[in-house]
Amino acid sequence: MTNLRKTHPLMKIINNSFIDLPAPSNISSWWNFGSLLGICLIVQILTGLFLAMHYTSDTTTAFSSVTHICRDVNYGWLIRYLHANGASMFFICLFLHVGRGIYYGSYMFLETWNIGVLLLFAVMATAFMGYVLPWGQMSFWGATVITNLLSAIPYIGTDLVEWIWGGFSVDKATLTRFFAFHFILPFIVAALAGVHLLFLHETGSNNPSGLPSDADKIPFHPYYTIKDILGVLLFILILTSLVLFSPDLLGDPDNYTPANPLNTPPHIKPEWYFLFAYAILRSIPNKLGGVLALVLSILVLAVIPLLHTSKQRSMMFRPFSQCLFWILVADLLTLTWIGGQPVEHPFIIIGQLASILYFLLILVLMPIASLLENNLLKW
């Protein structure tokens, strides 16, 4: 068996990726989220596949088909809520994974990091289109509002929006194409994740100290396989608790009302994991400016490696940078809260200040703090 594992062309790839992979001996539980994201993707693809067997992407029957899944299909309610809450778990793991990358300087692996940013965009696009499919009120109006933002693009904006809609409003054509894209994108995400791993294994994993770990490597199996299994068990515990005890905790009650183009909900807002970006979008009074800020709020991740001014890789031994990092985390939580609030005083000004602070921290304050730390260490 050992021989086959190391000689068979397919088994060799698996062996070099998950069994005999040399891994740093000191990577903490913050390194568990990569495997958890893989599990999330598998759960989403499987539950999504079973949902697609019963779902109809037609405006007249989409809402009814989701109701039918929940009421009449064996364990349909379980599959539906695993899929919906699985998306929330996916984003929790994503945010923690990206946060880990920023804290420990993993972004210095440029190829891996850039593919990761691309993956983040792809997953966000997938989640947005998936939210439209149940064809509830928030599905319809969320799709209308977010796609309409593209009309802010000069000259081609209006034509672009109508081209995406497949008509003059969000309708049957829009729903059908969103279903098609929502089905295909996770497989593209899986392929990109493979490339992400390929690039990572070219360099090997980073570790909390940010120092080279070539002198102290251990095999991935059994040490990190057992550690990943513990992470997966905790993940399953949280996901099943969420699904079985409060499946609608993170959803919007408006989505239990069928889509009605003649009736606008009082507060249109996306799912919780987009609220921070939505808050940044709303904090700018100009439409095009808001759209640019929205895109840049994620795209700013791609410039983080260029702004690394510290002589150390990780933040483990940099208290100033640590303080700014946790202020950034608090700021993102503030933006998430603001994104779910109505557009009125004092939420408007809080959102604007939090948006300014977000970009200021990443683009200005953190690079300056790194230079200051270099100076204090006389480097």
Swiss-Prot record:
Cofactor: heme b
SUPFAM superfamilies hit by this protein: a domain/subunit of cytochrome bc1 complex (Ubiquinol-cytochrome c reductase) (SSF81648), Transmembrane di-heme cytochromes (SSF81342)
Localization (cell): Mitochondrion inner membrane
Alphabetized GO MF terms: metal ion binding; ubiquinol-cytochrome-c reductase activity
Gene3D superfamilies xref list: Cytochrome Bc1 Complex, Chain C
Primary localization: mitochondrion
Matching CDD domains: cytochrome_b_C, Cytochrome_b_N
GO cellular component: mitochondrial inner membrane; respiratory chain complex III
Binding site residues for heme b b562: 83, 182
Residue ranges crossing the lipid bilayer per the database entry: 33-53, 77-98, 113-133, 178-198, 226-246, 288-308, 320-340, 347-367
InterPro entries with a match to the protein in the record: Cyt_b/b6_C, Cyt_b/b6_C_sf, Cyt_b/b6_N, Cytb/b6-like_sf, Cytochrome_b, Cytochrome_b_C_euk/bac, Cytochrome_b_N_euk/bac, Di-haem_cyt_TM
Positions annotated to bind a ubiquinone: 201
Domain of life, per lineage: Eukaryota
Residues the entry annotates as binding heme b b566: 97, 196
Details of cofactor binding: Binds 2 heme b groups non-covalently.
GO biological process, one term: mitochondrial electron transport, ubiquinol to cytochrome c
Subunit text: The cytochrome bc1 complex contains 11 subunits: 3 respiratory subunits (MT-CYB, CYC1 and UQCRFS1), 2 core proteins (UQCRC1 and UQCRC2) and 6 low-molecular weight proteins (UQCRH/QCR6, UQCRB/QCR7, UQCRQ/QCR8, UQCR10/QCR9, UQCR11/QCR10 and a cleavage product of UQCRFS1). This cytochrome bc1 complex then forms a dimer.
Family under the similarity heading: Belongs to the cytochrome b family.
Other known facts: Heme 1 (or BL or b562) is low-potential and absorbs at about 562 nm, and heme 2 (or BH or b566) is high-potential and absorbs at about 566 nm.
Role played: Component of the ubiquinol-cytochrome c reductase complex (complex III or cytochrome b-c1 complex) that is part of the mitochondrial respiratory chain. The b-c1 complex mediates electron transfer from ubiquinol to cytochrome c. Contributes to the generation of a proton gradient across the mitochondrial membrane that is then used for ATP synthesis.
Name of the protein this chain belongs to: Cytochrome b
Species of the source: Sorex saussurei (Saussure's shrew)
